[in-house]
C-alpha cells in the first residue's frame, strides 16, 4: 500500500474530532456538529471548486459525524467524485464513504458501479484491491449482479498480482455467501482449484476459504482439490518453522492455512487414490506425533495454534471413520487433554470424544477414560464442562459399564445445576432402559430418579416405567413392593405418588399378603398423600380407589366413605366431582362380576420405541446436531420393553452430538375403559387412545406396531397407512449423484446414519427390517436460515423394481423452515429378490433457484436377511446341496481397510447373517448363514470369508439357490472390506 504523505494528515479533521471529544454535554456536541455541517454544506455549494484534498477532508468529517449516530443527507456526490481520483488516499476515502453510507437504492449506484468497473479494468493493483474491497464490504445482491462475472476472471487471470488474487477470492466468497445463485460455475472453477499450488501463501489461504464454501454445494466441480490440498498440507506439516518464516506463528508453520485445508478435506470422503490417501495418513500421523513433542515456546499463542491444528486433524479422522489406528491415537491424545489445566482444552477434548465414542473402532479406547470423565463430572467448576462430561458418559455407555455410569450420573444429579437436570434425567432413563440387566434394577433406577429430581422427571419417563411394569409379569410384584416402600417416606414427590397410585391400583394384590402392606394399609398410605397433590394426581388416585374396591372388597366401605364425602361430591373441580359421583355409583349398583369386568387389569401396552429419546432431542435443541444414532452396534443390548430381539444391525448407541436429525416420539401409554363416561382409569392422565383387548397380532402387524411413527392427531388416523406420494418415472429425474454408490455402501452393514449432507440439506436415515418388511424414516434438515419452497422428496423404482419392491411413502410439508427438519415415513415390502436399489429424488427451491438431488435409497437385498443358526453337520450338508456352478459366487480381493477380526465380525453381523462357531477348521475364517425373506419365496444363503493377514487379501465365497443373488451379495459384502 502506498505510504501516506505528510500532507495527508488532514489537520482540520483532527481539530474537529478533538472539539467533539472536548464537548461537556450532548447539547454542546450537537451544536458543534451542526456548525460543522453548515460549514461543509457551504463549501460544497460554493462557487469555488474544491480540490481533492478538501473534498477528502470534508467527506471524512461527514463519515465521522455519521458514525456518531447522526443522519447525513448530502455529500454523496462528492464522495463518488473521489472514486475518480488518481490519488490513493482520495480514492480510499471515497470507497470508505460508499461502503458505509450508500445503500443499493441510491440514485448514484450506477455512477458508483461505473467507477468500480473502471478500477477493476485498470492495471493498477492498488485500485483493483480497493474496488474489490468495496464490493465485498457492500456485498449486496445488486453488487453481485453487476460484478459476479468479472471477479472470477480477475481471480484466475495469469497476470493478476498476488494481492489482487487474494482480494478477488475473498470478494467472490462474500458474494457467494450472500447470493449463491449469482456466482456462475464455469471454466474458472477448474482453474481456481490450482490456486492451491500458488507460491503465495496468502493467495492459497484465500482460495481455500473460497473452495471450501463452493464445494459444499458443487462437490463434483471441485473434487480435484483433494489431492492438491493433501499435497499442500503435507508440505506445511513436514516443513520446519524456518521454511515458512513469513507465515510461521509462534513456531507453528501456517496454522490458519493448515486448519482451513483440514476443513476442506472434511467436505469429501477419504481419497480413493492409494498414494494420496497414504500421504494424507502420513500428514495426520505427523500432526499427532508433533502433539507429543515438548512445546517450543511457553507462550499461549504457540499452544493455541498447535492445538487448533490438532483438533481439526482429529475432526478429519473422525469424519473419515476408516482408520482404526488413527482413531485410537486421536482418542489417546484427547485423553491427555482431559486433565489439562486449560478449561477450554478439557471442554474440546470431551466434545470430540463424544463423537469418537460412536465409532466402532474407537469406542473401546474411549471407555478406558471412564474414571477421568467421572472425576470431571464430580470436580469441574465450569458447568459447560460438566455437561460435556455427562454427554460423554452417555455416549460411551454399553452393557459392560451401564450400572457404573448410571450410578455416577444419579449421584451427580443430586448436586447438578438446575439448567441441565432434566437432560441428565432423560439420559439416565434411556440408559437404564437400554442396558437393563434385570427389570428390578430398572425400576429401582427410575424410582431413584423421581426421589432425587422429581421436579425434572417428565411425563415421558414415568409413563415409560408404568408401560414396562404393566408388560412384564416378573417385575410387577417387585415394583409394587418397592413403590409401597418409597411412598412411606415423609417427603414424597408427586410423581412418586402418581407411579405408586397406578402400580398399586393394578398390582397391589401381589403384596397384599404381607400384613405390613395389607389392603387397608395400602389405601391409608395413598390417601395420606391425597390432599397434598394436584388435581391431576387426585384424579388418578380416585381411579386407584375404585380399582381397590375390585381388588380388595374389604376396603369398599372405607373407600365409599371417601367418595361420598362432600369434599368430593361437591368438589369445585368438575373432573374430580364427576369421577367421585360415577365411581361411587359404579361401586354401589354394579355386581361383583360387572365390577370385575369393568375394572379388570390393564392389558399390555403395544410395544413401541421409547419417546424419551425424542424428548432428549427436543431438550438438546436444533443446534445440538443430529440426534440420530450413527450405526455403532452393541450386540449385547436388549429392548427392555420386549420389542423384537435386536440384531447387531438394528441396535446402536445414540450419539450425543447431533445436527438437525431427530428420533420419532411414541405416544403416551394408552388406557382401557374403566367405566362409562369419565371413569376411565388414567385415561385423562395418559391422554391416549384406549387399548382394546384383541387377538394376538400377526408377526407383520407386530413389527409395524413396534415401528409406529408419532401418534396421529385423531384416533381414526391410526388405522391409515402412509399415503403414497406420486412416483415419477426414472425419465423425470436426473441421474444419481456421482457419490451415490459410495453413500449406499456406507449403509450395507448399518441402518442408521447421515445419508447425504451438503451446505443446504442434511438427509438422515433410521430404518428397521424384519422378514420381508421394513420401515424407514428419512429426516430432511434445512441447514440454512432460508425456507425451502416446493419441497418434494419422492421414491422412484427404476426398471423392473416396481414388481420386486413395494415402497409406500408419506408426503411431507412443501415448506421447510430454516433450521428445521421434516420426517418422511417409508413402508417397504420385498416382493421378490432385487439387484437395484430404489432412487430418492429430492426437489425444492432455495432462494428462488431450483435444486434437484437424486440418491440411491439404502435398501439392499441383504436388509431382508434373517440370521439362521445351524450345526456344523447341517451347514456342510446344505453347502454340498448348493454345489452347482451358478449357485456359487467367489471373489478374491485386496483388503481396503486394516484387517481386524472384531471389526470383520461386526460387519458380517451387520450384513445380516448369523456367524457360526466351530464350523470351519481354520479358526481365522468366518462362516455365516441366513435366509433372504421375500413375499414370493425364501432364498437360503451360506457364506465363508477367509482372511489372509500376511497377504492382506480376502477370499469370499457365497452360495445361494439363485445365481443373481449370489453374485449381488458377493459384490455388496466384498465392498465392505
Curated annotation (Swiss-Prot):
GO terms for cellular component: AP-2 adaptor complex; apical plasma membrane; basolateral plasma membrane; clathrin coat of trans-Golgi network vesicle; clathrin-coated endocytic vesicle; clathrin-coated endocytic vesicle membrane; cytoplasmic side of plasma membrane; cytosol. It is a peripheral membrane protein. The modification Phosphoserine is found at residues 626, 652, 655. It is found in: Cell membrane; Membrane, Coated pit. InterPro entries: Adaptor_Complx_Large_Subunit, AP2_complex_asu, ARM-like, ARM-type_fold, Clathrin/coatomer_adapt-like_N, Clathrin_a-adaptin_app_sub_C, Clathrin_a/b/g-adaptin_app_Ig, Clathrin_app_Ig-like_sf. The keyword NADP does not apply. The modification Phosphothreonine is found at residue 653. GO terms for biological process: clathrin-dependent endocytosis; endocytosis; Golgi to endosome transport; intracellular protein transport; negative regulation of hyaluronan biosynthetic process; positive regulation of neuron projection development; positive regulation of receptor-mediated endocytosis; postsynaptic neurotransmitter receptor internalization. Its main location: membrane. Component of the adaptor protein complex 2 (AP-2). Adaptor protein complexes function in protein transport via transport vesicles in different membrane traffic pathways. Adaptor protein complexes are vesicle coat components and appear to be involved in cargo selection and vesicle formation. AP-2 is involved in clathrin-dependent endocytosis in which cargo proteins are incorporated into vesicles surrounded by clathrin (clathrin-coated vesicles, CCVs) which are destined for fusion with the early endosome. Belongs to the adaptor complexes large subunit family. This is AP-2 complex subunit alpha-1. It comes from Homo sapiens.
